[in-house]
Each structure stands twice: as structure tokens, then as C-alpha cells.
């Protein structure tokens, strides 16, 4: 029997979105806290200013690996509040849209790198929080003329209109 022994990491989890230019210089490192995760993707994430520890880790990774464009790494804090590296990936992260909303278009910058263009980065830092949802929708061949729904805890939930149900009812009526 072989065992993998890992440190318990009870603290917050972070992703740091990075961009390295075609000359190997780290030009952008923007951390965000992974506040809610679904299917491995952060669906609620808050951006914050990088501290010295995060910048040091980003520069160290960048000096050891040959990046050309967008990449990211993930950290988690241990019981003592110290950062522990969990993952490094040379690709666009699922929630890198936070950087895009702040004016930093990582896919485009990466393409410019590949075309040999020098780039400048202007971070507007106007996107602090992203919250998104994955919704499944299905089509069926079941035919029906009437839909019954309960008012309490269906049409209204916690005193507010259930907008997803209302969307379905409008769709059913207009189909």
C-alpha cells in the first residue's frame, strides 16, 4: 500500500491571474479569492491587491518556468496562515473574466505575444467581484397544456419573486 500524505489546508483559497510578456517579464499578477466553487470553477470570486507574499511567489514561479502569455497559479492558506502552492497552469483560468472586466484581455494579450508584438497593460481595477451561475436547461418531447405551481416557496421564495420560475412560465406560455 502506498500513501500520499498532504498538509491540511483549512484556510482561504486563491487564484492569481498572471501575464508574462514575450521577453519573459511578469507584467501582471492579480489575485482573487475563490469564495464559491462549483465543478472546480470559482463561480464567486473577489479580487484584491496582491501582498508581498503573493508577488514573491508569482515572481519566483515566473523565473523558474518559461511562460509566454496568460497563466495562473492557485494557493491555499494553511493553519498558520501561510500560502501553499496548489497548482500552476499555462492557460486561461475559468474566472479570468474578472481581469477582462478590469480591462486586461488575457487571450488577446497572449495572441499579441505570439505575433511578436510588445504590449502594455492598463489595469482599471474596476472589477472587484464576480458571481455567476451554471444553469442546466433541457428540451423534452413531452406535450402538455397546463402547468401547476404552488405560490408559497415556488412563485415566491423568502418573500421574493422566483425569477427563474417566472422565466419558465413565460417560456411555457409563449412556446
Q: Which positions does each model-derived feature cover?
A:
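Glycine-rich phosphate/pyrophosphate-binding beta-alpha loops
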Residues: 35-45, 89-102
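Active-site neighborhood of HAD-like aspartate-dependent phosphohydrolases
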Residues: 142-147, 151-174
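Non-catalytic pre-domain segments flanking phosphatase-related domains
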Residues: 92-149
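Short, small/polar residue-rich loop motifs at catalytic or cofactor-binding pockets
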Residues: 13, 69, 141-144
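Short beta->alpha transition motifs characteristic of CBS
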Residues: 30-35, 88-92, 157-161
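Phosphate-binding site of ATP-dependent enzymes
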Residues: 1-65, 76-84
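Acidic active-site catalytic centers that drive phospho-/nucleotidyl reactions
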Residues: 74, 87, 149-152
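Internal helical hairpin/lid segments
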Residues: 71-73, 83, 92
Amino acid at each position: 500500500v502506498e500513501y500520499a500524505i498532504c498538509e491540511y489546508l483549512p484556510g482561504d483559497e486563491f487564484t492569481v491571474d498572471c501575464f508574462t510578456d514575450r521577453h519573459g517579464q511578469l507584467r501582471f499578477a492579480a489575485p482573487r479569492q475563490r469564495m464559491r466553487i462549483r465543478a472546480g470553477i470559482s463561480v464567486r470570486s473577489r479580487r484584491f491587491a496582491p501582498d508581498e507574499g503573493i508577488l514573491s511567489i508569482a515572481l519566483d514561479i515566473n523565473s523558474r518556468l518559461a511562460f509566454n502569455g496568460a497563466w495562473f497559479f492557485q494557493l491555499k492558506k494553511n493553519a498558520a496562515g501561510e500560502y501553499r502552492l496548489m497548482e500552476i497552469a499555462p492557460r486561461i483560468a475559468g474566472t479570468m473574466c474578472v481581469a477582462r472586466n478590469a480591462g486586461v484581455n488575457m487571450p488577446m494579450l497572449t495572441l499579441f505575444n505570439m505575433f511578436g508584438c510588445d504590449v502594455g497593460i492598463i489595469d482599471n481595477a474596476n472589477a472587484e467581484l464576480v458571481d455567476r451561475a451554471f444553469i442546466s436547461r433541457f428540451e423534452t418531447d413531452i406535450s402538455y397544456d397546463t402547468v401547476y405551481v404552488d405560490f408559497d416557496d415556488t412563485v415566491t421564495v423568502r418573500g421574493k419573486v422566483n425569477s427563474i420560475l417566472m422565466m419558465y412560465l413565460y417560456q411555457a406560455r409563449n412556446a
